[in-house]
Structures are given as structure tokens and as C-alpha cells.
Amino acid sequence: MAVLIETTLGDLIIDLFVKERPRCSLNFLKLCKKKYYNLNQFHSIERNYVAQTGDPTGTGKGGESVYSDMYGEQGRYFEREDLPKMRHTRMGIVSFVNNGDNMLGSQFFITLGENLDYLDDQHTIFGQVTEGLETLEKLNEQLADTNNRPFKDIRISHTIVLDDPFDEDARISFPPRSPSPTYEMLVKTDQIALDEKEDEDEGKTAEEIAEELQQREMAEQAQILEMVGDLKDADEVPPENVLFVCKLNPVTTDEDLEIIFSRFGKINNCEIVRDRRSGDSLQYAFIEFDNAKSCEQAFFKMDNVLIDDRRIHVDFSQSVSQNYKYKPKSQQQEAPKRRQSPQRRPEVKRSHQRSPSPRRRRSPSPKKDKKRDYRREPARRRRSSDNHRDRDRSYRDNNRDRRDNHRDSDRDRRRHDRSPDRRRDRR
């Protein structure tokens, strides 16, 4: 009463509790004999808990018992067996999965931990793993996602019944050979294949690994520059025919640098970068050659060369600004002329100035022919300081007039008080 299960991680031998669980043992043995579990996936693995399989769909919602061949649709699930009591006390216990209504189908799990007592009253134990505990250790070490689905594609490759104490039933059909894998199993999978290398650095030297890491860092930096807007495309590369020259003497000019580097080939552009305001040299320059070969020769020959009492440094340019540099009209390609359709009327060149309507045409006015008389032009606008000065002067004049008026009124009042008529009135 034993079954050999061959998995992609190793073999397992399961002994069945035929006397204690006869219906469960019959269901498991006949399903193994009819190759029902072949190519089934371990769709759920929880570390130190359980590894679940037995669902041909790989979703955890499918599967049916062998009694469906005997009794039809009503035998898809069968009632679980409770007695005698058995407990999940160690690694390697095999139990059928309860579908929620105390009914069992084809799905089963193998415990990967010890003392899992909370599984005793829910699921039905029908066997235990006697050989292949190292395979269970491998299952327990597998990494899984948040839904407990392993990243690796682990399957049951074959099942062999070593001992079957039950009689054969004519209603159960057994295939002559093991089923072949489907196209979805081989290609349409998002899991890691077993023959796929997990360690990408296996068989590589330290130099190759360091070079790959450097390339990854460069790609990450390029993507960051693209996101912040410094690069238009992360895969953009600088031109191969441009040299970067630094540590120049401030007195070195563009013409001198072009003459020195022109012996390696034709130079399209030689420019020393200067300060925008002062025009002083920033002591570095860009030299654009006609081809990449000349640029490479200059790189090997001119590095650390003495120019104007300065040891210059030469390197390939890493700037992509040359790709978007404005080209003068002499270097721009003219757009092809539009082809004239034979059915359309020939185009007539028109001036940008709109011709006046015949009704609006008038004879030229004699006033317009007169020369401009600058003597009648209005005076230029006064400055703001002049305006403020005039305003202050007018303010002082107004105050002076006001004081004079008050002084005159006081003088008249005193004269009136001194008059004889005013004195007579007081008496």
C-alpha cells in the first residue's frame, strides 16, 4: 500500500493508511494509477506549513475524486473520514484538502512543519512520507509570492503504484501511457523553469561580473536622467567623432587648438567654452572631427601633451548636446519641392502685402509729398525728475500765495480797528 511520486525536485514514497482510511486510500491509489496527478503543479507552498497539489488546473479550485468515474457528477466529491482520530504532528503527513463542506476531492497536501494541530479537525490524514524527506526540505526552501505561489515551476512528473490491495473496477478507465505536457505548460507560464539558471553569474569571471554591474549602473543612471528631463532617450549615445579637451591654458585660442589637432584629420568644429559675461576661457573645449577614426587617433596621441605650458587631458566626449546643436542654414537640407498636380492651376507668387481694393484706391495726397517739418514736432517728453521739480515748485508757489493772502487779511483787519468810525462805535 505505497505509492512512488516522482517530482521535479526529487522522489517521494508515501505509505497509505488503508485500514484507517479505506475510501481515501482507494481514491488516492486509483487516481495515481490512472495518471491523474501526472504534470500537476505544486500551486501553493508555505514555509514550515504545507505544500499543496492535486489540482490539474493549478488554481486550487479544481479537481475531482475517482468516484466521479463510478457514480457520475454526484461522485465528484466524497465525505471525509473522521475516525480514528489522527494528528498532524510531524513533517511528511499527507492529507486530503477539505473543500469547506467536509467533502474531499483530488487535492492533497504534505506537511512541511511539526505540531500543526489546527489542521486536525479540518482535513483528513490518509498517509505519510516514509522516504524522500530531503525532497520535502527542498520544497520547504522554495520562494513564493504573496499568494503562496512558488516562483519555480514544480510539478509531479510521474506516479507509480507500488502496492494496490483494492480490486479493479470496470467503470474506471486507465490510460495506456502517461499524458504529454500541453503547450500552456511548456510555453505559457510565468514561472521559472527548473532547467533555467538561477545564478546569472555562474561560470563568469570577476572582470565580466564587474563589467555587467557597471553597465547596469550606467543604464539606471541614463533612465534617471531621462525621467528628470536631462536626456530625451535613455538609449541615446554621445557622438563618436567628438573629443573633450580640458586643463587648457586660458590664453589658448580656438585657432591654435584647431591647428594642433588638424594633423589627425579634418575638423568640422573646434570650440573652447567661454564665460558668457566676461568671455574668459573655461579651460576646456570640444573638437568635432569628420570621422571617428581621426578622433580615435587624436585620443591616443594627444593625451598629456604640453600646449602653452599646460599638460592637457583628452577624452571622448560624453555629452549629447551635439546631437541637438542648431545647424546654420548653409548646412540644413532643403525640403523637397511640392509636386504640382496636373489638374490644379499653376501657383502664382503673391507678395505678402495685400493689394488695395479698387474702390479704396485714391490718388496720392499732396500733403504726403511734403517734407517733414520738424519745427512743428512736439517737444520731447520731460524726464521724471523735471516733472517732480515742477510739481514741487508749484506746491511752494501755492503755499506762498496762501501766506500772502492771510497776511493781507490781517493787515486789513488791523486797519479797520484803527479807523475813527470804529473808535466811535466802541465809545
Curated annotation (Swiss-Prot):
<dbReference type="GO" id="GO:0005654">
    <property type="term" value="C:nucleoplasm"/>
</dbReference>
<feature type="coiled-coil region">
    <location>
        <begin position="195"/>
        <end position="227"/>
    </location>
</feature>
<dbReference type="InterPro" id="IPR035542">
    <property type="entry name" value="CRIP"/>
</dbReference>
<feature type="region of interest" description="Disordered">
    <location>
        <begin position="322"/>
        <end position="427"/>
    </location>
</feature>
<dbReference type="InterPro" id="IPR002130">
    <property type="entry name" value="Cyclophilin-type_PPIase_dom"/>
</dbReference>
<dbReference type="GO" id="GO:2000543">
    <property type="term" value="P:positive regulation of gastrulation"/>
</dbReference>
<dbReference type="GO" id="GO:0002119">
    <property type="term" value="P:nematode larval development"/>
</dbReference>
<feature type="domain" description="PPIase cyclophilin-type">
    <location>
        <begin position="6"/>
        <end position="161"/>
    </location>
</feature>
<keyword id="KW-0804">Transcription</keyword>
<dbReference type="GO" id="GO:0005634">
    <property type="term" value="C:nucleus"/>
</dbReference>
<keyword id="KW-0805">Transcription regulation</keyword>
<feature type="compositionally biased region" description="Basic and acidic residues">
    <location>
        <begin position="384"/>
        <end position="427"/>
    </location>
</feature>
<dbReference type="InterPro" id="IPR035979">
    <property type="entry name" value="RBD_domain_sf"/>
</dbReference>
<keyword id="KW-0694">RNA-binding</keyword>
<keyword id="KW-0413">Isomerase</keyword>
<dbReference type="GO" id="GO:0003755">
    <property type="term" value="F:peptidyl-prolyl cis-trans isomerase activity"/>
</dbReference>
<feature type="domain" description="RRM">
    <location>
        <begin position="241"/>
        <end position="319"/>
    </location>
</feature>
<dbReference type="GO" id="GO:0003723">
    <property type="term" value="F:RNA binding"/>
</dbReference>
<dbReference type="GO" id="GO:0000791">
    <property type="term" value="C:euchromatin"/>
</dbReference>
<dbReference type="InterPro" id="IPR000504">
    <property type="entry name" value="RRM_dom"/>
</dbReference>
<feature type="compositionally biased region" description="Basic residues">
    <location>
        <begin position="351"/>
        <end position="370"/>
    </location>
</feature>
<dbReference type="GO" id="GO:0140673">
    <property type="term" value="P:transcription elongation-coupled chromatin remodeling"/>
</dbReference>
<comment type="subunit">
    <text>Interacts with ama-1, the catalytic subunit of the RNA polymerase II (RNA pol II) complex.</text>
</comment>
<protein>
    <recommendedName>
        <fullName>Peptidyl-prolyl cis-trans isomerase sig-7</fullName>
        <ecNumber>5.2.1.8</ecNumber>
    </recommendedName>
</protein>
<feature type="compositionally biased region" description="Polar residues">
    <location>
        <begin position="322"/>
        <end position="334"/>
    </location>
</feature>
<dbReference type="GO" id="GO:0000993">
    <property type="term" value="F:RNA polymerase II complex binding"/>
</dbReference>
<keyword id="KW-0539">Nucleus</keyword>
<keyword id="KW-0158">Chromosome</keyword>
<dbReference type="InterPro" id="IPR029000">
    <property type="entry name" value="Cyclophilin-like_dom_sf"/>
</dbReference>
<comment type="function">
    <text>Probable PPIase that accelerates the folding of proteins. It catalyzes the cis-trans isomerization of proline imidic peptide bonds in oligopeptides. Involved in RNA polymerase II (RNA pol II)-mediated transcription elongation, and in primary transcript splicing, including co-transcriptional trans-splicing, in association with the catalytic subunit of the RNA pol II complex ama-1. Also plays a role in the regulation of elongation-dependent phosphorylation of ama-1 to control transcription.</text>
</comment>
<comment type="similarity">
    <text>Belongs to the cyclophilin-type PPIase family. PPIL4 subfamily.</text>
</comment>
<keyword id="KW-0175">Coiled coil</keyword>
<dbReference type="Pfam" id="PF00160">
    <property type="entry name" value="Pro_isomerase"/>
</dbReference>
<dbReference type="Pfam" id="PF00076">
    <property type="entry name" value="RRM_1"/>
</dbReference>
<dbReference type="GO" id="GO:0040026">
    <property type="term" value="P:positive regulation of vulval development"/>
</dbReference>
<keyword id="KW-0697">Rotamase</keyword>
<dbReference type="GO" id="GO:0060282">
    <property type="term" value="P:positive regulation of oocyte development"/>
</dbReference>
<dbReference type="InterPro" id="IPR012677">
    <property type="entry name" value="Nucleotide-bd_a/b_plait_sf"/>
</dbReference>
<dbReference type="InterPro" id="IPR035538">
    <property type="entry name" value="Cyclophilin_PPIL4"/>
</dbReference>
